[in-house]
Amino acid sequence: MDRTKTRFRKRGQITGKITTSRQPHPQNEQSLQRSTSGYPLQEVVDDEVLGPSAPGVDPSPPCRSLGWKRKKEWSDESEEEPEKELAPEPEETWVVEMLCGLKMKLKQQRVSPILPEHHKDFNSQLAPGVDPSPPHRSFCWKRKREWWDESEESLEEEPRKVLAPEPEEIWVAEMLCGLKMKLKRRRVSLVLPEHHEAFNRLLEDPVIKRFLAWDKDLRVSDKYLLAMVIAYFSRAGLPSWQYQRIHFFLALYLANDMEEDDEDPKQNIFYFLYGKTRSRIPLVRNRRFQLCRCLNPRARKNRSQIALFQKLRFQFFCSMSGRAWVSREELEEIQAYDPEHWVWARDRARLS
């Protein structure tokens, strides 16, 4: 019994201490009475706030720091900007390159990522005043167009020159064997029947007849050189009725330049063209004779005529656009137009 009494006494002392500790302090009661008298109560928050609170800073969100706010602002600005579309990488596709029987060969081909909108963006960045409506017409193109218009106006004022078209090439069937056909590329000749008629008309000229009769060794006028004369007539671009004696000798002289290495035989063309023959001019290499010949007015006239012939030869060469070479196939085609013509009998192989 004594033990239980002592336990109750101790418990009563402890409860008394607790009640005294819970009783409000008189100073605290006064502060509470003042706060309730006329001012609103303030709520006390036990959460810790990092850093000193400056005036003007809202301490309401305690967990949001200044760095977090800046990151949020930057993220908002980045969201407001339009997202840039990345250009797609060029793709590759497989296309059919060759089909042989039942087998098909594929070839890998690169697909270009350039789109029409890229051309529009490029034209929009041009200088002000440039019309971007045609995407392929740039400022440089306009300048070229102006220069071209000026050149066309100047060409209209000058007489137009008719140039001979360049020869084309076609594919013709050479051989047919069973189900296989062999193709051969063949050159289309520009020689027309009117060119043959102009050549035959010039053969009736007395000076040309005399020249062909004099060349018995065929060193200047064999069948291939004469066929080149017809080819040059077709390339010069003149009408058939305009070809005269001078054109025949110009073409023959140019053909000798292209095919022959000996320069002496073709010099006889000058003497037949200007009314002289080679036999009438003595081959004397005496200096006194050469000096007297230089002082002769007739010799001066001959030199001026030869210089004029060389000038005309160069003009005739330019009228053909420099195409003085003639293939063997084209010469055979020219001769095949009239194979019974007496000119084609002038063959050097028969003389030997």
UniProtKB/Swiss-Prot annotation:
Residue ranges, compositional bias (Polar residues):
16-39
Instruction: Indicate the family of this protein.
Output: Belongs to the Speedy/Ringo family.
What is the primary gene name for this protein? SPDYE18
The protein's GO terms of the molecular function aspect are: protein kinase binding
User: Composition bias, kind Basic residues: at what positions?
Assistant: 1-12
Q: Domain of life, per the record?
A: Eukaryota
Family annotation (InterPro entries): Speedy
Protein name as annotated: Speedy protein E18
Write out the biased-composition intervals (Acidic residues). 76-90
> What organism does the record attribute this protein to?
Homo sapiens (Human)
Segment Disordered: which positions?
1-90
